[in-house]
Design a protein with these regions (language model features):
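Secreted, disulfide-rich extracellular signaling modules
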Residues: 4-7, 11-13, 17-546
Length: 546
């Protein structure tokens, strides 16, 4: 009986409640590290639409030309300055050189449109000679380009949105390059003074619509191999001058190749030997008719690509709202910590869902840093933080909601009358996930091999053991190899596997100045959802009384 009673007592002890002291250890936390947390939301009543007229025009990725017109923003046109520079650091045209032809070629990169029905419209491409080189102060995308008004091409080149851009220069323009001397090649400044380059653009559309055409510009690429080795491959982005000259008393045909817009004079042969690619930067400019839209936003916030209008949130507005709330809660902006801050910019889903491609993929908050010679836009979100919103579009919630936590922390600690407070204004720029593809040459060759094997195997099954064709061409001809090459699906699968290993694609977030964008967000005076600032902040607890 005593054992039974003891067992009951033991079980009761096991299931009994244990008191928990929530304050245990609290006395050991430093008093200056105790905080009260608060959340607040504010309507942003002051948002401006401003043109980003200080974007750099230089691009190392693509040549961009074209024009698009719409009913809201008007005409948005693009043009590109390209300098044609010899691939060698020495030239020899022989005696009495005679011009034959001068050809330009650039592979298609991509296109951008306002209406997908205009992806393949025909556009006339205008090519003019520069009358003077770009100046040292020509940096921004709205720079004035000084060029002639006479075409320098044979006929009128046409872009269709799918093919490479190819044309021939007129003899009057091309033969000028036959006057090139060794002294002209001593540096780029000397060279461009004599051969400043060309300007490419398209005709403006008569009505709404149009297209931006983007073309590649790099002449060399680094190709990696699975073994770890690499080599340099030449692309089809170049110009080539054909001529006839007298060499050692005999007239011969010859040619000179040019590449596009290097930053310095280089001998490409020497770069290939050390497996390096040259730095190339074309000068892409844009023109907008939307500057009349600049001003304080009402019920709509308009966003245009390129250097067109973008939303700007004044730092003074953020400081006024947040600091007033902190003081209201009994805190001091100097000692308050911002745990999280987000700007939400809502939009209405378009009635035609197919037009969502016009909206930026990323609307990134930045600040504008100006000096006497340069203007830089610095991103405010932390790209290395996976849980931080970079400003990606949310099609489900219909908003952009980038995190600006660290920036708001800086803003609230500035004095309200600080003359440099406007330097903390938030400029929203359009970003794009640029993809870079590297090729493994060995895997690509293996993929091509298996593809040919699958091709042959397919026809072997159709034509039997004697291959295909009247003479038994292909693998398995005459029946000798039929048993080994009759499984089309195995070879096709192996080809696809090898092909997947042949290329590696990486993505990086970059400023997008080239593509067309047109977005309408809800403004401060819109009915219903409006732009809002959401903040979570922590105020230090007061010291205990003595």
């Amino acid at each position: 009986m005593r054992k039974f009673t003891a067992i009951i007592a033991l079980m009761a002890g096991l299931v009994s409640c244990v008191g928990v002291d929530q304050n245990l250890g609290g006395d050991y936390i430093p008093t200056d590290q105790k905080y009260d947390f608060h959340t607040a939301e504010f309507d942003l009543d002051e948002i401006w639409m401003k043109s980003i007229d200080s974007l750099t025009a230089y691009s190392s990725r693509r040549i961009t030309i074209g024009s698009i017109r719409d009913e809201t923003f008007g005409l948005f046109s693009r043009g590109s300055v390209v300098t044609l520079v010899p691939v060698l650091d020495s030239v020899d045209f022989g005696k009495d050189p005679v011009f034959q032809r001068f050809k330009f070629k650039a592979a298609v990169d991509s296109v951008s449109v306002a209406d997908e029905n205009q992806m393949n419209i025909l556009q006339n491409v205008n090519v003019y000679a520069l009358t003077e080189p770009l100046g040292t102060k020509d940096y921004f995308s709205r720079a004035e380009i000084k060029h002639g008004d006479k075409r320098i091409t044979k006929g009128v080149p046409v872009a269709n949105g799918q093919d490479s851009l190819t044309f021939e220069f007129t003899e009057d323009y091309g033969k000028q390059y036959l006057s090139m001397t060794q002294d002209d090649l001593k540096d780029l400044k000397t060279y461009t003074k004599k051969f400043p380059g060309i300007y490419l653009c398209t005709d403006d559309p008569v009505g709404n619509g149009g297209r931006f055409d983007m073309f590649e510009l790099d002449i060399l690429r680094l190709v990696s191999q699975s073994s770890g080795a690499s080599y340099i491959a030449r692309t089809d982005n170049y110009a080539i001058l054909y001529f006839n000259g007298e060499f050692n008393g005999e007239r011969k045909d010859s040619s000179l190749m040019f590449y596009f817009s290097p930053i310095e004079m280089q001998d490409l042969d020497s770069l290939i030997n050390v497996k390096k690619v040259p730095s190339q930067y074309v000068f892409n400019v844009d023109r907008h008719e939307s500057d009349h839209l600049v001003g304080k936003a009402d019920d709509k916030i308009l966003i245009e690509g390129g250097s067109g209008v973008k939303p700007v949130v004044p730092a003074s507005e953020i400081q006024r709202l947040v600091n007033a709330e902190i003081v209201k809660k009994g805190g001091d902006p100097v000692t308050t910590l911002i745990s999280k801050a987000t700007i939400e910019m809502p939009f209405d889903f378009p009635e035609d869902y197919t037009t969502m491609f016009r909206y930026p993929k990323v609307l990134s908050p930045t600040i504008k840093i100006s000096t006497d010679t340069t203007v830089t836009f610095a991103g405010l979100t932390d790209a290395s933080a996976s849980d931080e919103n970079q400003g990606d579009i949310n099609r489900s919630l219909c908003n952009y909601a980038p995190d600006i936590t660290h920036h708001v922390q800086q803003i609230i600690r500035k004095k309200a009358d600080d003359s440099k407070l406007s330097n903390y204004d938030i400029w929203f720029l359009i970003m794009w996930y640029e993809k870079t593809t590297t090729t493994d040459a060995e895997a690509e060759e293996m993929a091509n091999f298996y593809q040919q094997m699958a091709y042959a195997s397919y026809y072997n099954q159709i034509y039997g053991g004697y291959g295909y064709g009247s003479y038994g061409y292909g693998y398995g001809g005459y029946g000798g190899y039929g048993s080994y090459y009759n499984n089309y699906y195995n070879y096709q699968a192996m080809a696809q596997y090898a092909s997947s290993s042949a290329t590696t694609t990486t993505s990086s977030t970059e400023l997008d100045k080239d593509r067309y964008y047109r977005a309408v967000l809800r403004g401060p005076k819109a009915e219903g959802k409006k732009p809002r600032l959401k903040v979570t902040f922590a105020i230090p607890k007061g010291y205990p009384e003595k």
